[in-house]
Amino acid sequence: MKKYLPAALIATVTILLSAACTGAAQPSAHSQTHTPAAINAPAAIAASPAAPAGPPAHPKFESTGLNAGWTDPETGFNISNDMWNCPQAACGRQEVWANSSGDWGVVSTMAKGNTAVLVYPAVQQQFGANQPALLGNASELVSTFTEAMPTTAGTIGEAAYDIWLNDWNTEVMIWVDNQHQTFYQPLLGTATFGGQQFRIYMDHGVSHGYPSGPFFFVLQHNETHGTIDILAVFQWLERAGYLSAAKDTLTAVDFGWEICSTNGVPENFHISHYTLTVQGIQLSAVSQPSCNDRRIQRGQSRRNRRPTRAFTRIGY
């Protein structure tokens, strides 16, 4: 795998986590679908089966810096210690470490009982280097993952994809491992992609005349490893009238953890495998001059949306 991708490349790419900006946090199969339906009772929250691995003795990268980042020289993907909703009283220490874009994690300490998302350590790939990455041009967009997060009662958060469209103006999240939180926003419907059942919710933002979400696709049953057909998610949103494949563009795909609380004690979070397979749309180059601006924009977007996100927390 080459570190740099030619700007003109529009082809099939299978990648082990990438990113578009060096050393900075950024703004952040085959489907069978069901017509939007009435609200279903949430499924029971399952526990992650394996305890997360802690940091190795000598990782290639480690930092406790606010929004510190590292680019994997083999893949060009960026890993970020994204602490977008810090500093505030509930924020504690968070250390990010990495050996590769497919082997990294954080040790996070967030206040007991806090219910607002404070941090989102994640790995990212950006799209549309020289031209907009139209959703209609994508013929495949699939990701695989293996992650582990704490399951203790005081842990509040989830492992999730955070996908940005339309130059950071539209947000789609896919929750795969949810610990001790649930939604009470209106349910848009349910869907099955690749044998996985999702409940689908939406906050009511609007950008450029279109709903900007965030949209939330929440697995009915937690998975700590699996395959996610991201393109099928976009296709469901288009059929429901929320996206247009002819107009909407893909900006970035992130994967990591939204962390609200670790019960005030250090907890390990670990990703041991991740791939993103892309066909038909253009990846961004490794480095872009607008990284810092987009990091700030992402923080502003999250500050506007996340602290007011309507959750009821369970599992105390």
Model-predicted regions and their roles:
Residues 20-22, 85-92, 261, 290-292:
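Sequence contexts marking disulfide-bonded cysteines in secreted/extracellular proteins
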Residues 54-107:
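Solvent-exposed N-terminal domain segments of exported/luminal and surface proteins
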Residues 111-192:
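Extracellular-facing segments of soluble proteins and assemblies that are Gly/Ser/Thr-biased and enriched
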Residues 116-134, 214-246:
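Beta-sandwich interaction modules
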Residues 24-43:
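Short, low-complexity, disordered segments immediately C-terminal to signal peptides
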Residues 162-232:
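Short helix-loop boundary/capping segments
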Residues 223-315:
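Long, compositionally biased interface segments
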Residues 1-24:
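Secretory targeting signatures
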